[in-house]
């Protein structure tokens, strides 16, 4: 019957409207990321085939010191700061960052660059992933969850 089609069509419209409400923030990632982010959970591991006794893994809310990345402030001018968990700024206080697709590149200097993948971002939550594989088969993996500070 034609009524069935109308119902399906209506549900489709409602469904779309619904998801539009949830997607209220259509700004580019480079704008959404601006601000201060406070670490709330960190997990990851370090594996080194050459020194397996040094392998480690973690999965916990932040303690006194962060495992791999701390709190961040990203600024519109393309600079960022990383902070200790007690709020003090790290020595390398202001560095540059860029973003392409969903990858943030932290540029500490011409030799030190870190690529962080944005797994999730909402108005008050950010999940970043760092995954680095060495030539020797070793790997450093870290996943950090933040709340807006």
Annotate the PLM regions.
Residues 1-11, 15:
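Single conserved hydrophobic/aromatic residue that forms the stacking wall/gate
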Residues 19-149:
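Lipid interaction determinants
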């Amino acid at each position: 019957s034609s009524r069935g089609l109308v119902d399906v069509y209506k549900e489709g419209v409602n469904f779309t409207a619904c998801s539009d409400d949830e997607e209220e923030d259509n700004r580019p990632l480079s704008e959404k990321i601006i601000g201060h982010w406070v670490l709330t959970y960190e997990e990851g591991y370090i594996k080194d085939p050459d020194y397996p006794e040094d392998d480690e893994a973690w999965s916990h809310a932040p303690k006194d010191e962060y495992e791999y990345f701390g709190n961040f402030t990203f600024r519109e001018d393309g600079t960022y700061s990383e902070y200790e968990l007690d709020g003090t700024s790290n020595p390398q206080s202001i560095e540059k960052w860029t973003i392409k697709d969903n990858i943030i590149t932290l540029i500490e200097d011409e030799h030190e660059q870190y690529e962080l993948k944005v797994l999730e971002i909402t108005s008050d939550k950010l999940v970043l992933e760092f995954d680095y594989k060495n030539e020797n088969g070793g790997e450093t993996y870290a996943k950090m969850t933040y709340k807006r500070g």
